[in-house]
Amino acid sequence: MSENNSENASAQTPASFPATQQAQNEAKIDGNEAVNRAAEAWKDAASRNLPPLGLGEVPVPDDTANLRQGPSLHDGLLGLLPLVGVWQGEGQAHNSDGEQYAFGQQLVIAHDGENYLTFSSRTWRIDAEGKATGPDVRETGFWRISPKDEIEMTYNSSNGVVEIFYGEPFNERAWQLESASTMVTETGPKNLGPGKRMYGLMPNNNLGWVDERLVEGEMRPYMSAELSRVAG
């Protein structure tokens, strides 16, 4: 495996994050008003959750992506609470080979009552007519956050990438992360540099995220998407 560190990666907020300034302004609204807006926007998703596996009982709780169902969220995760759910939408990619394409994404962020979140993303390519053409990259990983609001995210992808990200909340509705270690297998993307990600709730309560990568000494867009809550 090859490794790149993020010493040269800028600590600035990703410039292409959807509606970043609007998201900051939205974060300043009264807490009760924010809850009311979210409840109205997500009422159709409120009763949905991950389907049970149905393969027999195990002595640990099932994962839940709905804070109203299953085990209570661990107190240590309150700083990441708004992320929990099943999200789905579309985005744009500029991969390490220079190819640009549209993609669809389903992102599941769940918990089982322990002090971490599970992270599962699956993407599919979309053609010029908006039709899905087949599976793309999958990611699985975990989020943790310390009492000092220090975030750790680890993940591995189906195309041979393993990364460690560190970060912190940008505000109550956004989280910024920067890669500390980027490892690529022999068959993985050769030109993938260190990067940074930002996730945040937008004014419409959708989840926006952007991944930027270091290319020839500057941060450039890699992937970004806007996702609607479909469960949780």
What is each stretch, according to the model?
Residues 184-232:
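Mixed-charge, glycine-accented linear interaction segment located at domain edges/termini
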Residues 63, 70-76, 91-94, 125-129, ...:
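Short secondary-structure boundary micro-motifs
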Residues 86-92, 120-122, 142, 154, ...:
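Residue-level recognition of well-ordered beta-strand positions that form the cores
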Residues 97-189:
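Central antiparallel beta-sheet cores of small beta-barrel/beta-sandwich binding domains
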Residues 58-65, 121, 145, 177, ...:
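A generic structural signal for ordered alpha-helices
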Residues 51-54, 134-136, 192:
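Signature of extracytoplasmic/envelope-associated structural regions
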Residues 81, 110-111, 144, 168-169, ...:
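Well-ordered beta-strand positions
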Residues 2-116, 214-232:
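Amphipathic/hydrophobic helical signal segments and adjacent flexible N-terminal regions
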